[in-house]
């Protein structure tokens, strides 16, 4: 998915164990391999936390904007030890923020508002946002960064459970889209769906 062309955001959605975190790790590693810095946000345990300390990874934050590796002297949003995502990306024109389990981040929290600002400025900048989460929860998000990310109608819909899952991207799903093994789903680009099998990281 071209975040510059279809972005500045893409959504990876599916039920638990559908491969959405693996797809997000694969996307993050692909970006890092191309020299694009990545800021990772993971409110709960996620394979993305393994990227901490990797070259090009600006930081790996939890749902309270604290580094998962410890440290950090800021008090972002009034939380001791929390880091300001906007400060972490400052000085980088090109970067991507990868957020796993996005539905767990309140749109009204300091972190949620910072992610919203990153998405808003990405429309005219060279940075983007990759958001992963549960299909149902993301489909019912009506404000904040997750709702704004959906508006581009671009991303992955993994392990489709029902035709209503297409509501996330405001698309009608093709027949036979329901079911399949983990990683099976639809690539949706600007509202057009194509069947895919997501790659898994090495």
Spell out what each predicted region is.
Residues 95, 132-133, 139-202:
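Phosphate-binding and hydrolysis-coupling loops of NTP-dependent motor/remodeling domains
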Residues 1-153:
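P-loop NTPase catalytic phosphate-binding loop
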């Amino acid at each position: 998915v071209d975040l510059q062309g279809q972005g500045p955001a893409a959504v990876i959605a599916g039920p638990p164990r559908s491969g959405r975190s693996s797809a997000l790790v694969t996307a993050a590693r692909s970006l890092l391999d191309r020299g694009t810095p990545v800021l990772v946000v993971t409110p709960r345990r996620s394979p993305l936390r393994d990227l901490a300390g990797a070259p090009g990874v600006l930081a790996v934050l939890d749902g309270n904007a604290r580094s998962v590796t410890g440290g950090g002297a800021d008090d972002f949003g009034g939380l001791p030890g929390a880091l300001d995502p906007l400060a972490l990306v400052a000085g980088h024109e090109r970067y991507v923020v990868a957020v796993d389990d996005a539905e767990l981040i309140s749109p009204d929290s300091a972190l949620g508002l910072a992610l919203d600002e990153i998405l808003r400025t990405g429309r005219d900048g060279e940075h983007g946002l990759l958001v992963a989460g549960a299909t149902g929860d993301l489909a019912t998000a009506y404000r904040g960064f997750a709702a704004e990310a959906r508006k581009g109608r671009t991303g992955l819909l993994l392990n489709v459970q029902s035709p209503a899952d297409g509501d996330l991207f405001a698309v009608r799903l093709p027949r036979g889209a329901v079911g399949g093994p983990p990683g099976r789903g639809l690539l949706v680009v600007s509202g057009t769906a194509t069947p895919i099998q997501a790659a898994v990281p090495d």
